[in-house]
């Protein structure tokens, strides 16, 4: 640890244990709707009307540990709950359920001065380096603002520290009196870094800190963050959707989907041998800058379900290419993968109406499954085929076919009936994958 910039040399906590621990942390939001939204009538009760507000389950039952000095990368598609989790960790948002332990103390038990002191040990770097800096303030004032809030140093000491931090993040201390508009995006993010470090934190949540920067600038800022981590003994929770950024800076990686952590592993182990289908799909979607690469890269199919009503069991199952066959039916050869593909094509309506024989040829190579599964498939084909005998208009018949297939097959899969959670053998410490393929 370097010399003059540490304000507290005596850190009293067990460095062998986790610096931060989340135990079943959830964050749900009430969904704003119309005046009568959620109104329910029950004549057997008094009063007969009740209002149930829909809840957005942004983060659901997350349990992870972050060790002193490491960088835990948190990756996932936009809207999966990454930023909400980061803000909940810092108690910028209050958790709906669960406990957050920092240096062994439950943050829920802290208030007043104790919480204020703890917050000086936990800082955040925001995504947009422009909107996160007050354009009316000078750079020096911006960096000194957290120190003033926590009554650190006198005016002269704060100015000296701000100038020293400017130098540490790669800026000229003579820029102390400039305003943010005089700086580029990369330079503004360095100012954000200096501000976060001003109160000498142990833990920093980095919320997409380089996503708004040009690729040519990203590596420079990441290298600065790594150097500062070594110099100040920092621990990072690094949130990003760019896997190349995550691979650059992380020690371990947690993959998030629709509020759940679906995989957690050491960086190299996760990138070289992903164990969750969602992780594999993310990695396969990375563009390969190789003109000899003529095969198409993997693309995640289907839409992300609503966090208001997430799927039961595994939340990725509605898009998973490896949805497990329901045990209630006998499957041979490729019959289940073909049935699964047909079910999803009907649900997403990705093919034009056609005769039944052509549907069988395209999806089942002319031989649909037999037995009870075959009867269900035949009924669904009859509903959507142009020569089918089912009654009703076309939209109703497609909806009926979708419901039949999903209720008979998708909802009967173990992927729908049970939430998966498996600790896997690993040569690189802890490894977790929330996938029933590891039963």
Question: Where are the predicted features?
Answer:
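Conserved ABC transporter NBD signature motif
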Residues: 98-106
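Conserved catalytic motifs of ABC-family nucleotide-binding domains
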Residues: 200
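ABC ATPase NBD coupling module
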Residues: 51-53, 107-123, 149, 269-274, ...
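P-loop NTP-binding/switch modules centered on Walker-like glycine-rich loops
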Residues: 209, 213, 217-295
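Charged, flexible cofactor/metal-binding loops and thiol motifs
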Residues: 1-18, 31-47, 267-434, 439
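Conserved ABC ATPase "signature" region
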Residues: 38-47, 105-106, 157-174, 283-284
């Amino acid at each position: 640890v370097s010399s003059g910039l540490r304000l507290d040399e005596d850190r009293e906590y067990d460095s062998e244990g986790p610096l931060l621990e989340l135990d079943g942390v959830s964050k749900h939001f009430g969904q704003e709707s119309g005046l009568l939204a959620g109104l329910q009538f029950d004549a057997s009760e008094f009063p007969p009307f009740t209002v149930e507000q829909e809840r957005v389950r942004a983060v659901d039952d997350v349990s992870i540990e972050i060790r002193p000095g490491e960088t835990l990368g948190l990756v996932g598609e936009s809207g999966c709950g990454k930023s909400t989790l980061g803000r909940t960790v810092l108690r910028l948002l209050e958790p709906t359920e669960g406990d957050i332990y920092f240096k062994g103390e439950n943050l829920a038990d802290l208030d007043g001065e104790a919480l204020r002191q703890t917050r000086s040990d936990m800082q955040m770097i925001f995504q947009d380096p422009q909107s996160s800096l007050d354009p009316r303030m000078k750079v020096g004032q911006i960096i000194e603002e957290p120190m003033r809030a926590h009554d650190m140093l006198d005016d002269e000491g704060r100015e000296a520290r701000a100038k020293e931090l400017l130098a540490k993040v790669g800026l000229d201390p003579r820029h102390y009196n400039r305003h943010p508009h005089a700086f580029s995006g990369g330079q503004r993010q360095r100012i954000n870094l200096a501000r976060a470090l001003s109160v000498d934190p142990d833990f920093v949540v980095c919320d997409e800190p380089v996503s708004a920067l040009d690729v040519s600038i990203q590596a420079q800022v990441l290298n600065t963050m790594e150097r500062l981590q070594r110099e100040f003994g920092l621990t990072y929770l690094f949130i990003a959707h760019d896997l190349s950024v995550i691979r650059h800076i992380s020690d371990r990686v947690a993959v998030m989907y629709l509020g759940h952590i679906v995989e957690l592993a050491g960086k190299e182990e996760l990138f070289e041998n992903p164990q969750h289908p969602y992780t594999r799909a993310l990695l396969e979607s990375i563009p390969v800058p190789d003109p000899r690469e003529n095969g198409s890269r993997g693309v995640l199919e289907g839409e992300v379900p609503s966090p208001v009503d997430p799927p039961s069991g595994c939340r990725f199952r509605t898009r998973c290419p490896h949805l497990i066959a329901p045990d209630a039916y006998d499957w041979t050869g490729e019959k289940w993968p073909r049935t699964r593909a047909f079910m999803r094509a009907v649900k997403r309506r990705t093919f034009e109406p056609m005769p039944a024989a052509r549907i069988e040829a395209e999806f089942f190579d002319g031989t649909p499954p037999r037995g009870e599964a075959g009867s269900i498939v035949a009924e669904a084909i009859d509903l959507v085929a142009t020569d089918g005998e089912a009654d009703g208009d076309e939209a109703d018949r497609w909806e009926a076919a979708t419901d039949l297939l999903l209720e008979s097959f998708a909802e009967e899969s173990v992927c729908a009936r049970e939430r998966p959670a498996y600790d896997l053998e690993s040569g690189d410490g802890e490894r977790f994958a929330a996938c029933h393929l590891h039963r």
